[in-house]
Amino acid sequence: MRRLHRNLSLLFLICILNEYRIESQTLSPPITDRFKCLTNGCCDHHEWCRFWASIGECNANKDWMTENCQLACGTCTAPAAPLLPVTTTASSFNGGGFVQTTTQSSGPTTTITIPPSSLTSVTSCERVKDSIAQASELMSISRLINPVEDNFGRNMLSIDDITRSVPTGCVPQLSDVGVDCRKSLCYHLMYRTLDGTCNNLEKPMQGAAFRRFNRHFPAQYDDGKGEPISSLNQSRPSAREANRVMLSSAQSVVHDKFNNMMMQWGQFMSHDMSKTTLQPSANCKTCDPVPSKCMPIPIGEKDPNLGFKSKQCLKVSRSAPICRVEPREQLNENTAYIDGSMIYGSSLKDLHKFRDGRTGFLRVTRFNNQNVLPFDQSKCANKDKCTASFTAGDIRANLFIGLSSLHIMFAREHNRIAQKLTELNPTWSGDRVFQEARKIVGAQIQNVLYKEYLPKLLGVSFDKVIGPYKGYDTNVDATIANEFTTSAFRFGHGMIEEFYKRVDLSGNNITHGGFFFGDGVFKSGKILFEGGVDPIIRGFMTTAVKRPHRMTPAITEKMFGSTDLGSLNIQRGRDHGIPSYNKMRQFCGLKSANTFDDFADMILDRNLRAGLARNYNTTNDVDFYVGSMLEDPVIGGLVGTTLSCAIGEQFKRARDGDRFYFENPGIFTRSQMEEIKKSSLSRIICDNADNFELVSQDAFLLPGSNLTPCSKIPKMDLSKWRAL
């Protein structure tokens, strides 16, 4: 019976192999001897070992499988042995067919002396898991590193899957079916998955992409199920009126120390952590609400914007709800972790769009003597007729050329690191190079975020709301809070300026000049034909950042010619059922305000409190976005107490609940961790700009007269990644 079971399994797999073809070529015959071997001599002797293991053959045919499928069944007990020169074949099922790549290993050609170490090699990744704080060293000396994840039998989603689902009225969540972190333990101990699964080995779906946001409070809907706040019961002013009266202002107050990179890095980070699925805006053609799909913002008689008045409303599509979930919840398409999702995407099914085949590099395009993100050159014949969009891990890379510039910088940084790793380790596979470079880039982003950006944003609140790192906590869930992504971290829209300058090497305006904000939206041609990313980055670093407490007319009156970003933020909060400002004050340990003057502890300006009283019925009606933006900033920071609380709480969980946070022992070797601590945004700019010679040591500070040569900015020593 067992032999029959195995034969039926074999027949089933042969049927699959016959059905799926790649580029009109059938797959090569299975390898049946030493298909995959570790350096300790343990092998899977058949190409289908993992398939048989996935359907229970390790138990059903224990004797045969124990001997012949040692890796798939986890039955290897062999002692350490020399590296075997074997042919390895990696196969995976990606939903559209089997993808197979074969590489030939010629074995070691030189004798390498391993330096003395207190660690001794182990024979399995389960043993490494028992010494997790030394995982990186153990995996290396035991030669257990596997840069390819086994996804066979696991459900995966892609951006295309979500896009195809939206017209049905709802979107699916990523299922936990087939998610077994033990199956690819040697991969999971060293590298992140693209979709964030198995970061927490015991709770593998925490922080994963294509899952619902968390909440600090239950969703606040008019009907308790999904109707937006103030849609059935007119309890609040329209989002447009609230923004126009309370937040929109042509007055710009700038910071005396921080530069515009604070604004741009914040947007870059927000796209790393979350992306909400929206209903198609084409569904919203009138000023009448469409159930579950459209929630237009009416324009009042007193509104001075004649363009808005002529259209009578601002058309707003709702976020797509998750299927079969009530009350209504929204989907996060990105992972919750600081992992470079905006660079690499959040699904293995999408990676081919960004990665250069099976090499260690990201795809780039050489255009006008600069390496940029891939784009369709047929749509960019000249600067006056350029409608091309860059391809990146997050489609929003094209929203603003400042954001595009950071995307380009980090794609170049990945490839710079990948090139160096290839030179240091010529025997590494493309998969190994790619995963190591991706891991390093993610760690650099974390270092810049927690050591450079957040202390400036949060000022004296940083130590209280985030504090020093005390290690990975398996009980901390990094999943993004709806209150954070929908309201709190949209504070950065208040930092957007009317005009941005572009600066040359000498500190002068470039020939093409600066640009108004609206002229930098979806304008890739300005990068491709007007000097590249350098002048944009220099302009950001030499211009004081606008304090975020008011919103410039560039985004409240002129955004894309027909909408108001501030009103959109308020409306999105109501769409998602975000609790009121008063409720979030309580979450942050402040007293509940019974009168509008009770807000005086955080909103010192009595005129602002009076404005709230004129526009809102009660203190419990004030939108979180509006109230928090009006708060006076904390000492040394850019945001007020409630925002610093909501933002800090999320970033603390994103750090402490991330097994791959770079300071967590075992993720990198000790020497590698010390190198990552040397990284900085200034160094990344110096290494990847087309022509940068002088830079502020801290990329977020105005340079004054203290510019530093790039040669004196500390840099990582990538030789610490040379394999033994």
UniProtKB/Swiss-Prot annotation:
Cysteine-cysteine disulfides: 181-198, 284-294, 588-645, 686-710
A UniProt-annotated Pfam family: ShK
Residues carrying the site annotation Transition state stabilizer: 396
Family recorded in the similarity comment: Belongs to the peroxidase family.
Tissues with expression: Expressed in the hypodermal cells, specifically the head and seam/body.
Entry EC number(s): 1.11.1.7
Residues annotated for Ca(2+) binding in this entry: 272, 335, 337, 339, 341
One annotated GO molecular function: metal ion binding
Residues the entry annotates as binding heme b: 493
Disruption phenotype: Gross morphological abnormalities causing larval arrest with associated molt defects and low levels of embryonic lethality. Cuticle function and integrity are also impaired.
The protein, known as: Peroxidase mlt-7
Gene3D superfamilies the UniProt entry points to: Haem peroxidase domain superfamily, animal type
PROSITE patterns: PEROXIDASE_3 (PS50292), SHKT (PS51670)
One annotated Gene Ontology cellular component of this protein: extracellular space
An individual GO BP term: nematode larval development
UniProt keywords, alphabetically: Calcium, Developmental protein, Disulfide bond, Glycoprotein, Heme, Iron, Metal-binding, Oxidoreductase, Peroxidase, Signal
Enzyme class, broadest EC rank: oxidoreductase
Active site: 271
Cofactor: heme b
Domain ShKT positions: 42-76
Catalysed reaction equations from the record: 2 a phenolic donor + H2O2 = 2 a phenolic radical donor + 2 H2O
SUPFAM superfamilies associated with the record: Heme-dependent peroxidases
Propeptide position ranges: 25-178
InterPro entries xrefs: Haem_peroxidase_animal (IPR019791), Haem_peroxidase_sf (IPR010255), Haem_peroxidase_sf_animal (IPR037120), ShKT_dom (IPR003582)
SMART domains according to UniProt: ShKT
First and last residue of the signal peptide: 1-24
